[in-house]
Protein backbone atom coordinates (compact mmCIF):
# COMPACT_ATOMS: atom_id res chain seq x y z
CA UNK A 1 0.00 0.00 0.00
CA UNK A 2 2.76 2.55 0.80
CA UNK A 3 4.27 1.92 -2.65
CA UNK A 4 0.98 2.72 -4.35
CA UNK A 5 0.56 5.94 -2.31
CA UNK A 6 4.03 7.10 -3.36
CA UNK A 7 3.14 6.51 -7.04
CA UNK A 8 -0.06 8.51 -6.61
CA UNK A 9 1.89 11.35 -5.03
CA UNK A 10 4.45 11.38 -7.86
CA UNK A 11 1.72 11.31 -10.52
CA UNK A 12 -0.10 14.19 -8.83
CA UNK A 13 3.10 16.21 -8.59
CA UNK A 14 3.88 15.57 -12.28
CA UNK A 15 0.36 16.62 -13.29
CA UNK A 16 0.61 19.83 -11.25
CA UNK A 17 4.02 20.60 -12.78
CA UNK A 18 2.63 20.18 -16.30
CA UNK A 19 -0.36 22.35 -15.45
CA UNK A 20 1.92 25.09 -14.12
CA UNK A 21 4.09 24.93 -17.26
CA UNK A 22 1.02 25.20 -19.46
CA UNK A 23 -0.25 28.19 -17.48
CA UNK A 24 3.08 30.02 -17.75
CA UNK A 25 3.37 29.18 -21.45
CA UNK A 26 0.13 31.10 -22.01
CA UNK A 27 1.70 34.30 -20.65
CA UNK A 28 2.82 36.27 -23.70
CA UNK A 29 5.73 38.67 -23.59
CA UNK A 30 3.85 41.13 -25.81
CA UNK A 31 0.39 42.52 -25.04
CA UNK A 32 -2.58 41.35 -27.06
CA UNK A 33 -3.77 43.36 -30.04
CA UNK A 34 -6.38 45.99 -29.18
CA UNK A 35 -9.95 44.89 -29.75
CA UNK A 36 -11.97 47.09 -32.12
CA UNK A 37 -14.81 49.17 -30.72
CA UNK A 38 -18.28 47.64 -31.06
CA UNK A 39 -21.06 49.72 -32.63
CA UNK A 40 -24.01 50.65 -30.43
CA UNK A 41 -26.97 48.35 -31.17
CA UNK A 42 -29.74 50.07 -33.14
CA UNK A 43 -32.25 49.26 -30.39
CA UNK A 44 -30.43 51.64 -28.01
CA UNK A 45 -30.44 54.63 -30.39
CA UNK A 46 -33.22 56.97 -29.27
CA UNK A 47 -32.92 59.51 -32.12
CA UNK A 48 -31.88 57.63 -35.28
CA UNK A 49 -31.78 60.79 -37.45
CA UNK A 50 -28.34 61.64 -36.08
CA UNK A 51 -26.89 58.25 -37.05
CA UNK A 52 -28.05 58.11 -40.67
CA UNK A 53 -25.61 59.25 -43.39
CA UNK A 54 -26.74 61.87 -45.91
CA UNK A 55 -25.21 64.18 -48.49
CA UNK A 56 -23.41 67.16 -46.98
CA UNK A 57 -23.09 65.61 -43.51
CA UNK A 58 -19.79 64.78 -41.84
CA UNK A 59 -19.17 61.62 -39.77
CA UNK A 60 -18.30 62.20 -36.09
CA UNK A 61 -17.12 59.15 -34.13
CA UNK A 62 -17.76 59.13 -30.35
CA UNK A 63 -16.02 56.29 -28.50
CA UNK A 64 -16.33 54.99 -24.96
CA UNK A 65 -12.82 53.95 -23.97
CA UNK A 66 -12.46 50.59 -22.28
CA UNK A 67 -11.94 50.57 -18.54
CA UNK A 68 -10.97 47.79 -16.16
CA UNK A 69 -12.31 49.79 -13.23
CA UNK A 70 -15.32 47.85 -11.95
CA UNK A 71 -16.92 51.00 -10.55
CA UNK A 72 -17.32 52.59 -14.01
CA UNK A 73 -17.17 49.56 -16.30
CA UNK A 74 -20.90 48.79 -16.15
CA UNK A 75 -22.14 52.39 -16.10
CA UNK A 76 -23.80 53.52 -19.28
CA UNK A 77 -22.74 56.92 -20.62
CA UNK A 78 -25.68 58.88 -22.01
CA UNK A 79 -24.73 60.79 -25.17
CA UNK A 80 -26.36 64.06 -26.26
CA UNK A 81 -26.08 66.03 -29.51
CA UNK A 82 -27.18 69.68 -29.40
CA UNK A 83 -29.06 69.06 -26.14
CA UNK A 84 -31.01 65.99 -27.34
CA UNK A 85 -30.31 62.54 -25.92
CA UNK A 86 -29.38 60.26 -28.80
CA UNK A 87 -28.02 57.03 -27.29
CA UNK A 88 -25.96 55.54 -24.49
CA UNK A 89 -22.50 53.98 -24.69
CA UNK A 90 -21.31 50.96 -22.75
CA UNK A 91 -17.67 50.00 -22.18
CA UNK A 92 -15.85 49.59 -25.52
CA UNK A 93 -18.66 50.84 -27.77
CA UNK A 94 -18.78 53.65 -30.32
CA UNK A 95 -21.40 55.54 -32.29
CA UNK A 96 -21.03 57.53 -35.51
CA UNK A 97 -23.11 60.69 -35.85
CA UNK A 98 -23.64 62.42 -39.19
CA UNK A 99 -23.72 66.16 -38.54
CA UNK A 100 -23.74 69.28 -40.68
CA UNK A 101 -20.50 71.29 -40.75
CA UNK A 102 -20.29 73.86 -37.95
CA UNK A 103 -20.16 73.88 -34.17
CA UNK A 104 -22.29 71.30 -32.37
CA UNK A 105 -22.64 70.54 -28.66
CA UNK A 106 -21.77 66.96 -27.85
CA UNK A 107 -22.47 66.01 -24.25
CA UNK A 108 -22.17 62.97 -22.00
CA UNK A 109 -23.43 62.09 -18.54
CA UNK A 110 -24.17 59.16 -16.26
CA UNK A 111 -26.80 58.59 -13.62
CA UNK A 112 -24.29 60.03 -11.11
CA UNK A 113 -22.76 62.91 -13.14
CA UNK A 114 -24.13 66.12 -14.60
CA UNK A 115 -23.96 66.61 -18.37
CA UNK A 116 -20.45 67.46 -19.59
CA UNK A 117 -20.59 69.30 -22.93
CA UNK A 118 -17.96 69.96 -25.54
CA UNK A 119 -18.27 72.58 -28.28
CA UNK A 120 -17.32 70.37 -31.21
CA UNK A 121 -16.31 71.91 -34.53
CA UNK A 122 -17.48 69.55 -37.27
CA UNK A 123 -15.56 70.02 -40.51
CA UNK A 124 -14.73 68.01 -43.61
CA UNK A 125 -11.18 69.47 -43.50
CA UNK A 126 -8.78 66.49 -43.17
CA UNK A 127 -6.48 68.53 -40.90
CA UNK A 128 -9.05 68.17 -38.12
CA UNK A 129 -10.25 64.99 -36.48
CA UNK A 130 -13.93 64.28 -36.00
CA UNK A 131 -13.47 61.89 -33.09
CA UNK A 132 -14.38 62.27 -29.42
CA UNK A 133 -13.45 60.03 -26.51
CA UNK A 134 -15.53 59.32 -23.41
CA UNK A 135 -13.43 58.41 -20.35
CA UNK A 136 -13.64 58.44 -16.57
CA UNK A 137 -11.13 60.20 -14.33
CA UNK A 138 -9.62 58.87 -11.08
CA UNK A 139 -12.66 60.19 -9.15
CA UNK A 140 -14.93 58.10 -11.43
CA UNK A 141 -16.38 61.23 -13.07
CA UNK A 142 -17.18 61.19 -16.76
CA UNK A 143 -15.06 63.22 -19.21
CA UNK A 144 -15.26 64.03 -22.92
CA UNK A 145 -12.28 64.98 -25.10
CA UNK A 146 -11.61 65.56 -28.77
CA UNK A 147 -8.84 63.18 -29.85
CA UNK A 148 -6.44 62.89 -32.76
CA UNK A 149 -6.69 60.13 -35.34
Give the location of each predicted region.
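Short loop/turn and low-complexity linker motifs enriched in small/turn-promoting residues
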Residues: 2, 27-149
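Bacterial N-terminal signal peptides that target proteins for export
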Residues: 2-16
